[in-house]
């Protein structure tokens, strides 16, 4: 039993070293801009992906967010591992006021029906 506890502590300490400390507080419904490092040819650049957080899964180092945007009339969703070294930055542009943990119903909506009310607070808080 004691060996199991030590193994869990070792795993927790390794994960803590890998986690990013400077991430903003992200909630479902927020409008975010995620900077992703991508490699094209021999060059590396940061590509911005801006959209609404429709789901959050897992915790700790395995935390993921699903971000959805509509591009040229087609819905695009990407799942980001927020503590990944490929993620350069995450900015919260606007806080959304929602009453659900998962916003998958937005997939069925079109145009203005996909809008989410803004929270009264500022995005920095």
UniProtKB/Swiss-Prot annotation:
The protein's role, per its UniProt record: This protein is located at the 30S-50S ribosomal subunit interface and may play a role in the structure and function of the aminoacyl-tRNA binding site.
Biological-process GO terms, alphabetical: translation
GO molecular function, one term: structural constituent of ribosome
Similarity annotation: Belongs to the bacterial ribosomal protein bL19 family.
Gene that produces this protein: rplS
Protein name (database record): Large ribosomal subunit protein bL19
Natural source organism: Synechococcus sp. (strain JA-2-3B'a(2-13)) (Cyanobacteria bacterium Yellowstone B-Prime)
Presence of keyword Ribosomal protein: yes
HAMAP family, alphabetized: Ribosomal_bL19 (MF_00402)
Keywords annotated in UniProt: Ribonucleoprotein, Ribosomal protein
Cited Pfam families: Ribosomal_L19
GO cellular component: cytosolic large ribosomal subunit
Keyword hit for Repeat: no
PANTHER family in UniProt: LARGE RIBOSOMAL SUBUNIT PROTEIN BL19M, RIBOSOMAL PROTEIN L19
InterPro entries, A to Z: Ribosomal_bL19, Ribosomal_bL19_CS, Ribosomal_bL19_sf, Translation_prot_SH3-like_sf
